[in-house]
Amino acid sequence: FPRYDAPVYGDLISRFLRGDFGSNESVHPQLVALLFAEDRHGAAPEMKKTLTEGGTVLLDRYVYSNIAYQCAKVADSEEAEKLRDWIFNTEYGNFALPVPDLNIFLDVPIGFVESRLKSQRGGEDRDYLEGGQDIHEADIEFQKRVRDIYRKQCELDPKFIRIDCSDEYGEMLPPGAIFAKVKEVV
């Protein structure tokens, strides 16, 4: 998630991330959270069908992503907690999305994140930007707040596992080493 090619919400999410509705700070995080939640809500029947048939659903960015990215926009910790609870209630309660057995946060060195965000990237997964920049990716300080929220969620939820993707020098581990760590918790 998000599914940029999904009707209605995929288009709205793409437009938001391009900045068509304003800056990251100017669009209320609860409204943005609802866009991402509705995208998952639209995919819920397919996920539930797969699970009912005994299959496995493996997702990149789910409910905790919504919490991290939207709560990072809220300076007041009490308000951020209210937003967190609202997102949980909306996605798992009102929309009845499947609750994961396990969440994994791949905690990468912030220097690696910064260098990746500054580099020119392309590919089909970037088509939604139409040559522009993702407003969530434009601000490294925002990315640091997102990371902090992910880390906090790992402390609060025993089903949310943090995997440190850095070596003893703070550099990014090679993919094989990260995969080995993932296999240990799965």
Task: Describe the function of each predicted region.
Residues 8-15, 108, 112, 145:
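Generic alpha-helical secondary structure signal
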Residues 4, 62, 108, 166-167:
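Short beta->alpha linker loops
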Residues 1-95:
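ATP-dependent small-molecule kinase phosphotransfer cores
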Residues 2, 105, 162-164:
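Structural signal for conserved beta-strand scaffold positions within catalytic alpha/beta enzyme cores
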Residues 111-186:
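NTP-dependent small-molecule kinase module
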Residues 59-62, 87, 96-118:
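Conserved phosphate-donor/acceptor-positioning beta-strand/loop module used by diverse small-molecule
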